[in-house]
């Protein structure tokens, strides 16, 4: 099951795709994507529109994609996450990007790729983190995973305490 956190709202399910996009640059190209409920920085599907309001159909998976990939992803909206997400790739600006987002402990290959010429950013993001992460040790993904583990530990201790 996909492990996520929401910064401001309850999530309907941990296994559904949500369609909302983020405009990440003021350059000639914009970034579009899937994000987590409660995250900031989302806009409509149009590159000419930019606001921080979330679309009404948000669910919970964070998946940044170039607008050319929209037709590839739209068939999964509101459905169970497919076992293999490797087919979701950006265009030549972000070659060979993919991600396994089936559970917190296997979050990997989050990438952030920038084009200095256009100012556009392409990549994958993680729940609750504004922006993107990369594959380096400086990536916030470890903090995100550890935070989820700490949350589970706290919940376990809380339940034990109330049983005593």
Curated annotation (Swiss-Prot):
Residues 1-29 have a biased composition (Polar residues). Residues 1-62 are annotated as: Disordered. Residues 43-62 have a biased composition (Low complexity). This is Uncharacterized protein PB21E7.11. It comes from Schizosaccharomyces pombe (strain 972 / ATCC 24843) (Fission yeast).
